[in-house]
């Protein structure tokens, strides 16, 4: 029988792992070992093999360990894909209906979490794209020309190029997290996003009910007259 492992289940598993790794009940360690690599491939650095999940392999790990380091709460963060804002790139926009039958435009992603609807700028500020210039003439959006840099609560355009993009500011990555966790392909999510008073205004602004921030016109219609007529 087939099963669907949803994105929400993956997020829950990640949260549970972080919670377990940072609690006082469990202890996690990172180790180095394998002092005699004669029998192993020299291409591991660029092409590591898939791990063998067996009791024999686990015994080998223990037998060849040299040193361990305990993982503390400051050593763990949840991570997301890193989309560094670049001029001329067409980004996806946030939509709650992305699926295999209704893919993101223009990336073709089959789920919200695999689409490129958020970016980080050169100052490590993170934004969600609420509108990517989609209109009846540009059904897959337009290239982004203005880098978002603002920290306003309300969504807005990043500049005056007229690229059609509307961005919403989320958070700024802490310098300590940048130094420890930032990489080419992934960036950290704040560990105190849900509790920090510094993020409270952004959280509250994003969760108020009854808001309509973006309206996208996908069909202008026909035969409806001009705007200066009375009906």
What do the PLM-derived regions correspond to, one by one?
Residues 1-126, 130-231:
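Feature for peripheral, non-core segments
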């Amino acid at each position: 029988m087939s099963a669907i492992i949803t994105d929400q289940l993956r997020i829950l598993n990640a949260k549970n792992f972080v919670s377990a790794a940072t609690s006082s009940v469990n202890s996690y360690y990172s180790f180095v070992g394998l002092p005699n690599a004669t029998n192993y491939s020299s291409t591991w650095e660029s092409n590591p093999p898939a791990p063998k999940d067996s009791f024999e392999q686990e015994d080998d790990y223990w037998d060849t360990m040299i040193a361990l380091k305990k993982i503390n709460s400051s050593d763990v963060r949840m991570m997301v894909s890193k989309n560094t804002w670049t001029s001329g790139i067409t980004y996806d926009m946030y939509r709650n209906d992305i699926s295999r039958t209704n893919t993101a435009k223009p990336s073709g992603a089959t789920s919200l979490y695999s689409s490129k609807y958020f970016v980080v700028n050169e100052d490590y500020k993170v934004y969600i794209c609420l509108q990517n210039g989609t209109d009846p003439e540009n059904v897959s959006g337009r290239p982004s020309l203005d880098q978002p840099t603002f920290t306003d609560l309300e969504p807005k355009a990043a500049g005056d190029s007229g690229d059609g993009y509307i961005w919403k500011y989320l958070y700024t990555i802490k310098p300590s997290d940048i130094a420890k966790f930032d990489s080419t392909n992934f960036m950290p999510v704040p560990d105190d996003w849900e509790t920090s008073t510094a993020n409270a205004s952004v959280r509250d602004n994003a969760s108020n009910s009854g808001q309509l921030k973006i309206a996208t016109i996908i069909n202008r219609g026909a035969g409806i007259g001009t705007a200066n007529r009375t009906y």
